Amino acid sequence: MSFQTVFQRYELKYLLTQEQKKKILQAIAPYMELDQYGRTTIRNLYFDTGNYRLARHSIEKPSYKEKLRMRSYSQADPESPVFVELKKKYRNVVYKRRIALPEKEAMEWLQGGSCSQDVQIFREVDYFLSYYRNLAPVVFLSYEREAFFSEERIYKTSFSKYGTAYQSMIYPGLVQPVYAKATEPGTVREAVCYG
């Protein structure tokens, strides 16, 4: 399976009504087409420190921020491939590096184990893990996405719809979402945006 491991792009994000989405789809129709996967369910498990250092920093809207997540495009089991992604944003430019691993191996690595791979992206994630120390999964976020690309695949427009579908969780029975105050370290939370 071939996949892109390094990304650099500008991201502009907007909240849209259904009517606005419809108008944008009409406007881009001559120039862009739905990607090969159509509508996709994306599941992210974000890692942070016990005091939510990464999330708190991100909320401050700094010129530089970073995050670590595990992403799946299907319901994952221990042998399913997932992506470990290190995402950094500097002055509106997003840099993303990712690697594919079986879910069980990825989770063990991200929670303090070691990884047998020796490529640059693994070393970058290892550095991130050692720098922030004791990272744990804290937020699960699932949403539906439709992505459209220009013919040259230079431009991408995507629409994401967030919801509360518990059945689409990446870890059934392991990480159950609970609503908790951000001051409760180690509590997994589900972030839900309605739109």
Q: In which residue ranges do the predicted regions lie?
A:
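Phosphate-end processing signature that detects enzymes handling 5′-triphosphorylated RNA
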Residues: 1-195
